Amino acid sequence: MFLWTDDQKNAFLRLKEALTTTPVLGMPTTTDVFYLDNDGSDVGFGSVLSQRQGDREVVIAYASRVLSKAERNYDVTKRELLAFVVGLKTLRHYLLAQHFVVRTDHSALQWIRRMPEPMGPLARWLTLLEQFDFEIQFHSGVKKCKLRWVVEETALRRG
């Protein structure tokens, strides 16, 4: 059973505030590499853009949205790729003409650009990816707490 009282609501609001203000949310630099983390779930997905500045990782921006009814039928790989594509579209003003690193815990994304004959949405998405200079790094169990918060918060706000 899930219990949501004023204590839980207040804790959630404090967490939300902490994740969206400095020192967590920072300004981008022109000298540091960008990192893009994405996560998809059954209800939505989110992206977090960050940079390693000095001895800490600084979040630059968040992006998220709820899945449409049709998108909820996508398999996990397609949802993860959709999260990546929407993150790129939303955060493109940071990422165009920059080399950046995409960190994922979904190993299938590593080979997505080598797909032999993509069709439909996959073909359109791969065309979009060609505009960007990035490398994909697979990390088993990438920390997703910030991403999970972005996804769940978006789902809560939009019902």
Predicted regions, residues:
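Acidic, metal-ion-coordinating active-site neighborhood of RNase H-like domains
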Residues: M1-G159
